[in-house]
């Protein structure tokens, strides 16, 4: 992925102009809470500038029919490729991202027989040690829940319109797509990344 272009002279925003709604933190969280299928499986999808709550995520997917509830928190590490990280910053195309999250969660319900799906992604600055994504799923049994949660996470990183800027302690920064690396942190080859 190429770096984002630098603003052209004269294109800077006037501080008194309002931000577009997709960049204005006061218009968030952007949420979609809905159900899937004839049995009304609960789906909660969220983009937010606020701290993520694991408890809230588990409350959304827990049910009497769920014998297994899986929770994943993705947190900001203090290094990336041996460079000390100051923070991450995320941006998104919210309307498209929520549409993608809805499609992914609906696919997961069908594919793994899940009883509930909760996906929340932070936007803006996320300091070291704080969560940038939470995925929670409920299912009748642990096998479906484990596989479903991992599948949801990997597909979210691959498909959803959220971009990450890594800001380093030395002052440098890099824009990245989440799909550039696999679940073990290894760079994907072009062949692996062709979709």
Swiss-Prot record:
Highest rank taxon of the organism: Eukaryota
Gene3D superfamilies the UniProt entry points to: Molybdopterin biosynthesis MoaE subunit
Catalysed reaction equations from the record: 2 [molybdopterin-synthase sulfur-carrier protein]-C-terminal-Gly-aminoethanethioate + cyclic pyranopterin phosphate + H2O = molybdopterin + 2 [molybdopterin-synthase sulfur-carrier protein]-C-terminal Gly-Gly + 2 H(+)
Any Gene Ontology CC annotation: molybdopterin synthase complex
Main location: cytoplasm
Region (Disordered): 1-37
Pathways involved: Cofactor biosynthesis; molybdopterin biosynthesis
Bias (Low complexity) ranges: 25-37
Residues noted as binding substrate in the record, renumbered to the chain: 141-142, 157, 164-166
Protein name: Molybdopterin synthase catalytic subunit
Organism (species): Emericella nidulans (strain FGSC A4 / ATCC 38163 / CBS 112.46 / NRRL 194 / M139)
Lineage, opening ranks: Eukaryota, Fungi, Dikarya, Ascomycota, Pezizomycotina
